[in-house]
Amino acid sequence: MYTLKRFGQHWLNDGAVLDRIVAAAGLACGDRVLEIGPGLGSLTARLLRQVPVVAVEIDRRAVAQLQRQFGGDKRFVLVEGDILREALPEPANVVVANIPYNISGPILAKLTGSLAQPIRRFRTIVLLVQKELGQRIAAPPGSRTYGALSVRLQYLAECELLFEVPSHCFTPPPKVDSAVIRLTPRPFALQADDPAHLDALVTRAFATRRKMLKNCLKGWVETEKLLAAFASLDISPDARAEDLSVERFVQLSNRLAESDYPSGAARGDRRA
């Protein structure tokens, strides 16, 4: 079956890589997997060897092939539709998928939620994504790729880049390399008192990279108040956004939000 560009289709055909993806999920008795965009069913077949699978597929050609291939297996449920419009299947507690790169962001948001409304229903989420995106998601503080996306997702889940997948493992080969990431949603050891404030802080902090944080937040919070918060948290007054860990961002947000919102602050303001 030929691929359709509008669906961002690239068939993963390397058996060793497929096996590593399944292994990364650590599947156990009682698990039920949500697979997004199963395509030709190469990953589906391996998942079904261990656990039941609920698959969501938008391409009618793939739906017909999957029904022929797995329709007789009672542990396989196929939903024809758009994952961004469909409700997440209730029984599934694990996600394993090779997702379309052109809608990776919306899919991640669908699976993990937002800072204000996190989704914790999945035990683990294993996704094949564009390598650059995987690096940004799992980036540590101080690294070149650490940014607003890193902070938001690492607040919601433990984020790991497990291994890279070269383009020749796909048909047709994408123009970029890929990577497998694992997200483990977690109860928060450090909870933001006001997630909307944290979201706005992160957005403004990373609006201009390499700029000192106190300058990024100028006009949003009084400099005197900001420097006092820095001092109380042992944050350098010359710190940049990329220097702060997720925990530090939460602590700073909590400290700044102890009083009224600073003049001009927008709840949930997102520009990054």
UniProtKB/Swiss-Prot annotation:
S-adenosyl-L-methionine binds at H10, L12, G37, E57, D82, N98. It is an enzyme of class 2 (transferase). Its EC number is 2.1.1.182. It catalyses: adenosine(1518)/adenosine(1519) in 16S rRNA + 4 S-adenosyl-L-methionine = N(6)-dimethyladenosine(1518)/N(6)-dimethyladenosine(1519) in 16S rRNA + 4 S-adenosyl-L-homocysteine + 4 H(+). It comes from the Bacteria. InterPro entries: KsgA/Erm (IPR001737), rRNA_Ade_diMease-like_C (IPR023165), rRNA_Ade_Mease_Trfase_CS (IPR020596), rRNA_Ade_methylase_Trfase_N (IPR020598), rRNA_adenine_dimethylase (IPR011530), SAM-dependent_MTases_sf (IPR029063). GO terms for molecular function: 16S rRNA (adenine(1518)-N(6)/adenine(1519)-N(6))-dimethyltransferase activity; RNA binding; rRNA (adenine-N6,N6-)-dimethyltransferase activity. One of its GO terms (biological process) is rRNA methylation. PROSITE patterns: RRNA_A_DIMETH (PS01131), SAM_RNA_A_N6_MT (PS51689). It is found in: Cytoplasm. GO terms for cellular component: cytosol. Specifically dimethylates two adjacent adenosines (A1518 and A1519) in the loop of a conserved hairpin near the 3'-end of 16S rRNA in the 30S particle. May play a critical role in biogenesis of 30S subunits. Belongs to the class I-like SAM-binding methyltransferase superfamily. rRNA adenine N(6)-methyltransferase family. RsmA subfamily. NCBIfam families: ksgA (TIGR00755). This is Ribosomal RNA small subunit methyltransferase A. It comes from Gloeobacter violaceus (strain ATCC 29082 / PCC 7421). The lineage of its organism: Bacteria, Bacillati, Cyanobacteriota, Cyanophyceae, Gloeobacterales. The gene is rsmA.
